[in-house]
Amino acid sequence: MSETATSVDGRPLSKRGERTRRKLLEAAEAVFAELGYHDASIVKITEAAGVGQGTFYLYFASKKGVFDELVVDLNHRVRQAMTEAASQGTTRAEMERLGFAGYFRFVADHPALYRIIRQAEFVSPEMLHLHYERLTSGYVTGLRQAMEAGEIAEGDPELLAWALMGIGELVGMRWILWAGRDELSPEMLDELGRIIARTIGSGNGGR
């Protein structure tokens, strides 16, 4: 599924169309997170977005259509947040630590991420797979390059990427989502950096 926004018939959107589509996606994020997929409805989404039902169908074909597009949208934005944060690092361990911090900030701003991705397991399994495949794709490339450069220990970059994603997802769930925090404390982030450094075989704790 493409990350480029289009109308339901595949035509490029105007700036106004992009804004309307964004409003609908933000409304869908809130409605699906609060009510769950089965209790959510197009009526509730359009009411939350402040647009008519006819407008909805210019951008999405169905409730499942907007759900699938929402998964793609959240995936794109969380990857962007992590990449931008990680780009400030100068070593792989530093990049990992900063990338995780970017992920936790995104989770604090968008707690619906967890609820919607978990719903995808039952509503749209193919979108669940797409979400994680897109997360790991660039991650694997970066880890492989770090291994080839001798910056981290050699190993299976795909296995390492999935293991690190598991750490980030569960730490974010426990200490951001469940605890209602905006971010991990500096002390916890430092400790997590040391755990990651040991996991990837780097002598640098990310600080």
Language-model-derived ranges and their functions:
Residues 18-26, 38-39, 50, 58-83, ...:
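An amphipathic alpha-helix adjacent to DNA-recognition modules
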Residues 69, 83-112, 160-164, 189:
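Hydrophobic alpha-helical connector segments
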Residues 1-8, 105-106, 137, 141-148, ...:
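C-terminal peripheral helix-coil segments that are non-catalytic and often amphipathic
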